[in-house]
Amino acid sequence: MKTLWLSLLLITLTSSIQANDSLRFTHKNSVQFELGGNGLFYSFNYERIILNGHRFKTSGRIGIAYYPPSSGIIDLWIPVLINEIYSFGKHHIELGLGYAFTYSATRDAENNPSNWEWEGFYTGRLGYRYQKPNGRLILRAAFTPFLEGPSPFIYYNFHASGGVAVGYAF
């Protein structure tokens, strides 16, 4: 009888451990295309899961967005974020903080660049993520605000933004 109870206890513990491991992401790298979001109107992103816990995961993400000079938008955006992901199986809540580096040019009358400089915006992320722990498809929707400043004319300026993304994990 003692052996039976011990066997049942071991089976229960083993299945509990296996169930928790199934919440970890199998694929720790991903590429994503985002409309809106931290790259303003669009961005291509690479993400790496740094800490892969049962419920809590931490990721680092870097993206890039380029806008031609004729668009009137800052030329280059490079958003860099650290995200904390809380998992409920295949559904996740994301909370992130970062900085969107921008590289832009002052242009002359013929639209030729005369002076390039790095600037940027503080940015964040609060959103939903759909990704099965062993799946490759990633779907995301998030509130992605920007904080601009300080400058000679404003202390800080808040810009509300949002984005949706689709990605592939590998």
Model-derived segments and their meaning:
Residues 1-23, 166, 170:
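Bacterial Sec-dependent N-terminal signal peptides
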Residues 19-75:
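Short glycine/proline- and aromatic-enriched beta-strand/turn motifs that initiate or cap beta-hairpins
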Residues 53-59, 66-170:
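Outer-membrane beta-barrel transmembrane domain signature
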